[in-house]
Amino acid sequence: MADSKQAPLDSAAAAKAAFASVQDKPFPNDIFTASELRWAVIGCGVIANQMAQSLALAGRKLAGVANRTLSKAQAFAEQYGIEKVYETVEDLYADPDIDAVYITTPHNTHITYLRAALAAGKHVLCEKAITLNSAELDEARTIADEHNVVLMDATTVLHMPLYQELRRRMDAGDFGRMNLAQLNFGSYKEYGDLTNRFYNRSLAGGAMLDIGVYALSVMRLFMASQPAEVVSLGNTCETGVDVAGGIVCRNAEQQLGVVSLTLHSKQPKRSVISFDKCYIEVNEYPRADHATIVWTADGHREEVHTGTEAYALCYEMADLEKAVAGDDSKRELLGYASDVMELMTKLRADWGVVYPEEE
């Protein structure tokens, strides 16, 4: 973990540093444990490149790629040694040699690809935010069930081993009762160009779908049930998307969640989960592999290291392969994603944030 006194890296720089830290290390043999599927990716942006680089660490490759611009798909395939380049996504869906599809396109395009890929019998791992709203996600889940395929949300916190280990200990009663989850996420995005994806309503911009999904996912993972009460204040910009928000949630067990988000200021990506017996602090939580537990009785600090940041995207892909192989605990992750989407849909409605596809 980086020195806490240093300024945190932006996400791209952090990913690059993480990859460099494991470049010469053997890949763990406990990540990909289910039968290997043949994967194709839709989209050739930053996250698709990170996935290809992650797989290379494991000695694996994507089997195919499709992109709106064919030349970009061809260049991507050449860079990563991918065998198949599809002229259209329909060609990808029709290929019987592809088992699973990874969708990395802008948020507002996801449902179109989800409908077609799932109906074609492909398992799907879809980047966050998995859909624009709960109605779209419910539709995608129905299609997946009808065609007996796995749909999985690629929000990293749902798949990082650190959270699985902390939840295991929480469920075992090690920490006592969970009382309060506090999460911050501030990402400074220059406000001058309102056509960029962060502020562009036509690209489903805004803080909620881009960064809020991480904070709400961590919150929901540690709460015993979905919050029934949600109060908030949100700020929007002239394009109509949300740029900041303060959120307080409470569930039937009287557990509280407090979340702050902003695209106008840098904040630490910091989560503090407070229990009777301790509190757990996780910094840079979207791909975290380290947590500090501070015990109430004596102030002792326990350092927990589980998983590796550089393998974040491998954990996502491995979880889908495990779900396909019959691991119900991995299939259940979509339930948390659905709860988070329900919260985000309500919050955007409260703030008056409506995308063109929803009008």
Q: Model-predicted segments: where are they?
A:
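C-terminal helix-rich "cap/oligomerization" subdomain common to oxidoreductases
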Residues: 1-33, 100-102, 252, 319-359
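N-terminal Rossmann-like dinucleotide-binding module
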Residues: 2-80
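Short active-site oxyanion
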Residues: 38, 60-64, 99-101, 205-206, ...
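Short, conserved SAM-binding/catalytic segment
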Residues: 75-82, 140-146
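Short acidic low-complexity segments
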Residues: 83-96
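Beta-strand-loop-alpha-helix segment that lines the small-molecule cofactor/substrate pocket
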Residues: 100, 106-107, 111-158
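Predominantly a Rossmann-like dinucleotide-binding segment in NAD(P)-dependent oxidoreductases
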Residues: 157-230, 238
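NAD(P)-dinucleotide binding in Rossmann-like oxidoreductases
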Residues: 235-242, 251-321, 328-335
